[in-house]
């Protein structure tokens, strides 16, 4: 597959991800939005799991761990956007996770990054952190801590998913089951409260939730 095509796909994925987070931030019922998104993921990936082999017990453990980490990540995102602006939280969480992954991959995994590659990652992450910096606004300590915790969750589930894909005889087995189940914690949370979540939805939330669910995977 040509490298430019992979690069183009990654750009589209990044744009879709940014749109999803913008929808999440500027919504008065973000938990409901996540609940609808989780339902969309279930509807999309349930038919697909019938076309792949069942996961092994070891893969099941990784899939369950990934689902829990994704659940924590999504809840942290909600709280992060409650205490911090999108322009503050998003660059820190994304830049921080990239830096963590680069460090962990270099030290503990077989993936080796060249010195120039590592410096490039540092420069990009530094640029992302600068986007969040503002002289006008007081430093948002709570938002910063939540953004860092979000970055930790992103790095954690990315590592788990990377291991799962590599340990699968059929990579789609892990991928489809992971995408089917990773929204279940958020779905459960969205059903637990009376005044927010899936118990309080309207047409506008439904449309945005379906759009989110299509873009998110």
Where are the predicted features?
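Membrane-interface interhelical linkers
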Residues: 1-68, 74-86, 133-148, 179-217
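Structural motif at transmembrane-helix junctions in multi-pass transporters
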Residues: 28-33, 77-94, 110-112, 116, ...
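Selected transmembrane alpha-helices and immediately adjacent juxtamembrane segments
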Residues: 142-166, 170-173
């Amino acid at each position: 597959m040509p490298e430019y095509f992979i690069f183009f796909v990654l750009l589209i994925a990044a744009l879709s991800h940014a749109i999803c987070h913008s929808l999440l931030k500027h919504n008065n019922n973000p938990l409901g939005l996540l609940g609808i998104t989780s339902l969309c993921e279930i509807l999309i990936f349930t038919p697909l799991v019938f076309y792949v082999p069942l996961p092994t017990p070891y893969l099941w453990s990784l899939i369950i761990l990934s689902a829990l980490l994704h659940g924590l990540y999504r809840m942290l995102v909600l709280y992060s956007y409650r205490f911090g602006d999108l322009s503050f939280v998003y660059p820190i969480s994304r830049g921080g996770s990239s830096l963590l992954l680069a460090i962990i991959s270099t030290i503990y995994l077989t993936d080796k990054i060249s010195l120039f590659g590592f410096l490039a990652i540092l420069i990009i992450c530094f640029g992302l952190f600068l986007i969040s910096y503002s002289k006008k606004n007081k430093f948002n300590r709570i938002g910063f801590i939540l953004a860092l915790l979000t970055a930790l969750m992103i790095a954690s589930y990315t590592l788990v998913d990377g291991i799962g894909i590599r340990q699968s005889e059929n990579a789609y087995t892990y991928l489809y089951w992971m995408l089917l189940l990773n929204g279940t914690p958020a779905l459960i949370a969205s059903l637990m409260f009376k005044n927010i979540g899936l118990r309080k939805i309207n047409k506008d939330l439904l449309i945005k939730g379906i759009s989110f669910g299509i873009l998110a995977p």
